[in-house]
């Protein structure tokens, strides 16, 4: 099945902490610059782009000179709060080099659950996009809670990006990660693991093969990416999971090159 993205106008791009923060804990400035260039190029071609960006914790750890993520929730929220400001400041500066304006939208799950607040945030997205601004979305870590009686967390930004793609009716979700896509088995263990180029149905076998948590700076593992693809399918959308090592590969993907894994349901043909 050939990839055809000519009709794609609205794109949600999700970038994870592992793509923004080097293994040393330092910020990957080159990667952020490349990402800003690619998004600005797409905007200049008439595309509408929303960026879902992790990284608040990684930025916070770097600024506060902390080597590892705190185990205490209040400290985690404090570090993320510091990091979010630094991350947005850097995004704003770098995007400005490409004459692109950005905005910040911080979400919690209850915002998209209640109809009134969902309508408000949907209108905010539409207004920003109509003004040629790139909304940069993250979860509001400083106030999100994950308690049984009042859970407001999305879980991680993989799922958040699928939610954003749904509420903005995006044509395509591109998920950048530190892996090349979805394999038939764990490529870090099995040398003969094969990359799945196209997934039309998310089977129990695929779900079972997706195990393990994320990086030390982030939270999302392969399972959350599969769950995100399921959410995208529920909204009749499509998603590409690809390596974020070179953000310019986004342009190649949109040209139809078979990078990463394309999650796209096969439409049933009805005969009269």
Swiss-Prot record:
Its EC number is 2.7.2.11. It is found in: Cytoplasm. Substrate binds at residues 54, 141, 157. It catalyses: L-glutamate + ATP = L-glutamyl 5-phosphate + ADP. GO terms for biological process: L-proline biosynthetic process. GO terms for cellular component: cytosol. It holds the Pfam family AA_kinase. ATP binds at residues 14, 177-178, 219-225. Its main location: cytoplasm. Catalyzes the transfer of a phosphate group to glutamate to form L-glutamate 5-phosphate. Belongs to the glutamate 5-kinase family. This is Glutamate 5-kinase. It comes from Streptococcus pyogenes serotype M28 (strain MGAS6180). The lineage of its organism: Bacteria, Bacillati, Bacillota, Bacilli, Lactobacillales.
